[in-house]
Structure formats: C-alpha cells, structure tokens
Amino acid sequence: MRIFKSHPLLRLVNSYVIDSPTPSNLSYLWNFGSLLALCLIIQIVTGVTLAMHYTPSVAEAFNSVEHIMRDVNNGWLIRYLHANTASAFFFLVYLHVGRGIYYGSYKAPRTLTWIIGSIILIVMMATAFLGYVLPYGQMSLWGATVITNLMSAIPWIGQDIVEFLWGGFSVNNATLNRFFALHFVLPFVLAALVIMHLISYHETVGSGNPLGISSNYDRLPFAPYYIFKDLITIFLFFFVLSLFVFFMPNALGDSENYVMANPMQTPPAIVPEWYLLPFYAILRSIPNKLLGVIAMFSAILIILVMPITDLSKYRGLQFRPLSKVAFYVFVANFLILMQLGAKHVESPFIEFGQISTVLYFSHFLVIMPLVSFIENTLVELITKKS
C-alpha cells in the first residue's frame, strides 16, 4: 500500500515491521523479541489497571490487593496475569540473552544493541524487585529490608543511603510510596529503552543469523513470513501462560506473601523470586558483606565485558566445539546457582555456591578468552598446513 511508504509515521512501521529485510535462515530462537514486546505490553496494561485500585500504604496495601482479588471485576485475572507474565518475561529474557551469547550477538557491529539490552535487563530487575514489595506480605517486607540493607555495606555512607531509601529508620509508608511511584514509572523507561534497542539494531546491520555470516545475499521481507512465524510462538506463549494463570497461578510465588507483613516476625527463609535467585546465591556465597554486594552487581554487569573478552575471530559458537562445551557448562552452572539461591545458608550449599560463583566469573574472564585463543590458534595451524 502506497500510504505505508508516504505517511511519516506509517513509513516507520513499514521499515521496521513490513519491509524490513530479514535473513532467510532464522530459526525460532529469533522469535523472543516479539514475545518480549508482548510481555511488556501485557505488564504495562495490567500494571496500570492494578494501580487504579492499589493503595500504597503500610496499613492498606495488603488489604487493597485482597480487594483487587475479591471485589474488582476480574481483578484476580489482572493480578495473576501481571504476576505470571513477570516470570514469563524473565524466562524469555534469559533465553534471549543465552541466544545472544551462543550466536555472538555482542560482537561488532551489534555491540551498542548488546549494551542497551544489558541496561534493559538491569532496569527489569530493579522494576521486578520494587513490584515484589508492593503486595506487602511477609516476603515483600523482609525482602525489601534485606535487599535495601545491602547498601549499608558501602563504607561510611552506607547506613545513610539505606535510611534515605527507606525514608525513615525501617521499611514504612514512605518506602512503600516511593517504591510504588518508581515501579509505575520504570516500565515506561523500559519501553523507551526497548525502542532504543530496536533503533540501534535496525540502524546497524539488522538481524544476525544462525550461521554467523553476512546475510546480505539472501533476505526476505519481514511481512508476511516472519509475522506468521512470530504468531506461532505468540499463540504457544498464550497457551502456556493461560495454564499458569488459570490452573496454577501461585506456582512461581511464595506462600509467605499471603501473610500480612509483620515487622515483629521473621519468615523461616527470605527468598527472592526465582529469576533473581542466581544472583542472590552469589551474594550469599561470599562471607564478607561488601564483597558479596560487589560480586552480585558484578555478576549482572559482567555481560557488558563480553565484546572485549571474546577474542575469537568468528561470530557465534556454531562451529567452535570447545566454546560450545564451555557454554553448556556455564548454562548448567547458572541453573545450579538458581537452585542454591533457594537453599538455607548451611553446609554443603555454601561450598557449592562458592565453587559455582568462581566458575560463573571464570567463564567470562578466563575460560572465554582462553578457549577462543586456543580455537584461533588451531584454525591458523590448519589453514597454514592446507
């Protein structure tokens, strides 16, 4: 249609969604972008709706959530959609990042896209933490207390920062108000970052492909081919999300959060949501509080160094067997850290956590550069012989 190429706004839609030249050999691993966009839309719509009925007050927050569940038309559906889509969002983001690591999406000329994506992940984690505090159940209160208290590890000014975050000497009304305000605003910041992510992705060389080579020789328009391909995974996503929302809405939550927050009673174990467990395990595996906090934040930020530490001359791990083994060991280790984050701080979980933490950082700082150097050397030796 001619209007799609002449109208200033529709021309943008056309260049990004309709005529965008896309490699012809993309697998379903390239479908996460559309699913993540869908998750963000669901979160913003359900979040704004929930905010209309929520009261950010220590006395009323828990009751207002119960009011949403019992009295608001389809309030239970909106809340469970919001909670379970948050888990789906993180699950898909981890797959998206894993795909990026496997296929070398962090290498030039896509480094800026990778950096913006990493910032999106950090903002997502901050937003999720703020949101987890809002129902003001036991886990909300004590999770907020533990995580904000991490700032007290900063020498000299740490305690002042904690009290500044709380707006008092403990988690109180001021804390809940500011957490609610930030949790409401950050998804829109996230949407802006996603647009930046898309612009940087389209303005460089566009999508990569499973072979890790230039795809300029064989491209297809995004519509209708990849729109239909995206729709397949979107329908599958709705099916799986519906199973959780309608049949097991609390499977990924914590039963302690159905108990009203009580500052006088500590829950048996303070555990964050499953998607933050690997980083919580790294925090707890280091006895020194300050070093633990530094390690936890470094574990998130370390993906930013990948464009520097990957010395390979080749994009992706498809044709690099040693790097493939290292990648699968890293994935297994990440899943082990996720399990350890939910365990009590006792032997042997402490020791396993320390081993897994060392292995996690070693992958980025030692194993990746070493393995890529060995592979480069082997390829050079073979090409010289031939």
Curated annotation (Swiss-Prot):
Instruction: Cite the binding residues for heme b b562.
Output: H82, H183
Q: List ligand-binding residues for a ubiquinone.
A: H202
Q: What kind of membrane protein is this, topologically?
A: Multi-pass membrane protein
Per its UniProt record, the required cofactor names are:
heme b
Pfam families from the entry? Cytochrom_B_C, Cytochrome_B
**Origin superkingdom:** Eukaryota
One Gene Ontology BP term is: mitochondrial electron transport, ubiquinol to cytochrome c
Keywords from UniProt, A to Z, are: Electron transport, Heme, Iron, Membrane, Metal-binding, Mitochondrion, Mitochondrion inner membrane, Respiratory chain, Transmembrane, Transmembrane helix, Transport, Ubiquinone
- Tell me one GO molecular function of this protein: ubiquinol-cytochrome-c reductase activity
Q: Its quaternary structure?
A: Fungal cytochrome b-c1 complex contains 10 subunits; 3 respiratory subunits, 2 core proteins and 5 low-molecular weight proteins. Cytochrome b-c1 complex is a homodimer.
Free-text function comment from the UniProt entry: Component of the ubiquinol-cytochrome c reductase complex (complex III or cytochrome b-c1 complex) that is part of the mitochondrial respiratory chain. The b-c1 complex mediates electron transfer from ubiquinol to cytochrome c. Contributes to the generation of a proton gradient across the mitochondrial membrane that is then used for ATP synthesis.
Protein name per Swiss-Prot or TrEMBL: Cytochrome b
